[in-house]
């Protein structure tokens, strides 16, 4: 798929036209100050990932074979008496219940898929970042704790507010969940650096965890005295604990902090696909491919870069090598 020409994109101003353009072909992210376009670009990425997946047989085979094996196992688990309708019900319950295990079972396959998709996205080739099965299990458990307990105090306080409390609690909970949908996708699409021995975006942020805190851990830095300090002490302690648990994903969170509108669009687009039962097993590889495209353009983007001046072929830090 050839990257979209910038002058062609500049002529498309409506959101639906932008969405079709961004979902139709790999395109660099808009400038940071273009918040609406950045949101639409992020929203279109899962659709772009799905388009790339179905158009390239090598990616489709890698994505579907493990899923078919997973479905076959669920069919065997659901096997039993009680008639056809009971078997169908047991099968779908087994499939839906086991779906959260797919990031663990398919972690290495997703990593290879993300690396193999890069040339199809106009990005320089990279080697996959392969985790051990133990790493995948530990990271999944920690992420589950962070996801479940991260905003529990805020949700609890919100429910105490009359009338609108439950609404605010739901908004906080869903916002936190969508945040971690993006984090998990970016983490699954991580690749090894282009140069052996070089640090990637995640390793750079992991060097000084106490000096490079994620946004949700910043309350621990509050310097308050008197009653205010006593009242906020539990929140500061909670933020510190949460920051330690989330330190592994500091690089992915930094991309969200740097490009919040892109992240918001990507989260919404991914959530819409993942909300479809059973089919979300097939959509998840598309989201990994989409995250690979996002990382290709944003992982090495400077923190203070005012505008996006990337080339329209290749990867920002490797375009010279690609053009040679």
Roles of regions detected by a PLM:
Residues 1, 6, 175-178, 319:
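Generic N-terminal initiation segments characterized by hydrophobic and/or small/turn-forming residues
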Residues 131-132, 304, 321:
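Short, flexible loop/turn segments with low-complexity composition
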Residues 317-324:
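Intrinsically disordered cytoplasmic terminal tails of membrane proteins
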Residues 303-315:
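Intrinsically disordered, low-complexity segments used as extracellular stalks/linkers
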Residues 139-179:
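Internal active-site segments that recognize and position negatively charged phosphoryl groups
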Residues 97-98, 117, 168-201, 284-305:
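Membrane-interface alpha-helices
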Residues 1-156, 194-200, 207-210, 214-223, ...:
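Helix-coil boundary and N-terminal low-complexity module in membrane systems
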